[in-house]
């Protein structure tokens, strides 16, 4: 009986050792799978510089916020608010030292310039990456809306003078501004397409974006003043 007990004990011992071996193999296998999954989850997706530039331009100039908001992981409402506030602030700054225009006049002028922005014609093309900096080429068709603005302003001002109106009156001044822009909008023409290269790089927080200087470069090409 004792011998039989020892025999059964050996069997159980071997079974236990086999189970431990299997458990060890299972642990290693699970460990490998977990490592693979963690690696896949922690690996950041490649930044799509082309989509970023396209959606940025669509949002800032054509008022199309969906893709831009998705890339920034914010709501369309917040994206729209952010862009509109920046734009309105830049318009307001133009009149900080001026007393001859009302808030309504500034708002009307800003609304008219929003129409100008929608004239922007661009096509995002090639992307090159080097040392974490993306160079994106954008083909733009320059609008002459600002090139004709001085002439439009002169024409509108002369019309107001003929009507006996005072150009220093805040309402008249605002009317000259908005009507001049409208006049240039109506005779807008596009020039020969040009290619502009802009850089998309990480900011201090590690997020990719277009610096103001790069956006200004694109805007100067789309809406030249000379």
Which residue ranges define each predicted feature?
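Single conserved hydrophobic/aromatic residue that forms the stacking wall/gate
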Residues: 1-15
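Bacterial N-terminal signal peptides that target proteins for export
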Residues: 20-28
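C-terminal motif of bacterial Sec signal peptides marking the signal peptidase cleavage site
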Residues: 37-40
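Core segments of small alpha/beta cavity-forming domains
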Residues: 42-115, 123
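A mature extracytoplasmic/lumenal domain signature
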Residues: 72-75, 126-128, 138-142, 212-216
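Surface-exposed, charged secondary-structure patches
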Residues: 93, 97-171
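Intrinsically disordered, low-complexity acidic Ser/Thr-rich regulatory segments
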Residues: 110, 173-189
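Short beta-strand edge/turn micro-motifs at domain boundaries
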Residues: 156-172, 186-226
